[in-house]
Amino acid sequence: MMKKRIVFVLLSTLLIATSCNNNDDTVLPSATFKVTVENVFMPKAFQSNGVFDAIPPGSSQSFSFNAGKGSYVSLATMFVKSNDLFYGFSDTGLALYDTNGDAITGDVTMHISLWDAGTEVNQEPGTGSNQPMNQSGPNTGDDENGTIHLVNDNFMYPSKESVIKVSLTHDGGTLFTVTIENLSNTATLATPLAPGVWAVHNDQTKLFTDGTTASAGMEKLAEDGDNSMMNGFLMNNSGYFSPFAPGVYAVHAATVKPIFTNNSSDIGNGLEALAEDGDPSALASSLMSTNGIVTSGVFNTPDGASNPGPLLPTNTYSFTITAQEGDYISIATMLVQSNDLFYAFDDSGIALFTNGNPISGDVTSSLTLWDAGTEINEYPGAGNNQPVRGGAMSGMDENGIVHVVNDGFMYPATAEAIKVTITLQ
């Protein structure tokens, strides 16, 4: 009997010990991560650019472009029966909107001038042996070694109004069309206008600068009517780029969609303010009280800066998180030169552990450019209701759903815009 009791006690003790072990919480792997968001856009001096063909007397050429408030257009076309003269607006270009924000339209020839590139000694208009229609080849005249200036060489030139007419049409939205007419078939000196270039830019950028030496591209355009080098320069320095706005992050359970749900309407948690105006505050506040979120916060101060601000090209935001196996991370940051677009992972975020191992490396391929569906999209970088020009809550409501952007406009590849790296600490 005593032996049976001893055996019973030993078995009971073993069962209790086993039971206690089964009730212990399993310790999941955890890790600390540094998340870095980098703006990898290449800054561009010009918003857009293009070329137009030669314009014989009695004919015309047109080109169109999108431009928002604060934009200017510049152009240059050679006065062919000269050594190095070209027509263009002032070096600051032509403002496309007036001080009231209304589009400028109509005949803008009054803003056109005949410029001397200062690169070749002038000869009498139409008769000079070193002018394109008379010379044996390009670049044959005597170097002037001067600077760009309004023509003032004591030769007689036909009035600009008898040679060229430039008209500006506003086609709705932010679309404009420029038409250049060659009227010189009835002038005292009929002349072709050579193939030219145009560019859209802000008030800090110039196609050329009065009083300075002409670029090699401007020299070829003004002396030989060859726009290829100037066009190459403009193509390399034109295009879309954008800051990113302060954003939010959340570490959460796999079943949680903390920021948005694909193909569903915005739930009013603050995504609209983030995606339209770059304001993460409402969304950050909402995340703090959302079930299934381990931790959340705002990234808003570029690394090396002392104050919050937008993320400009070559700069980074960074923040540190601690998570355990099973946790996911979501982020969102506005593409500022848009109406309501933002970069984020899928609506469920991405896992911070794979097979029990913490991830580390470039996760940019998991990012997508999303449309919040809250404001009607305008031409990227030119919309007058985008934050740079319109201010908060200025666009037309879309009343749509959150979806991968698909609006017919062209956007850069994700890897050309943003880079997100998660580094194990």
List where the protein language model places each region.
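Structured domain cores in non-transmembrane regions
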Residues: 29-105, 173-175, 184-347
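Mature, soluble, non-transmembrane domains
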Residues: 58-60, 68-171, 301-425
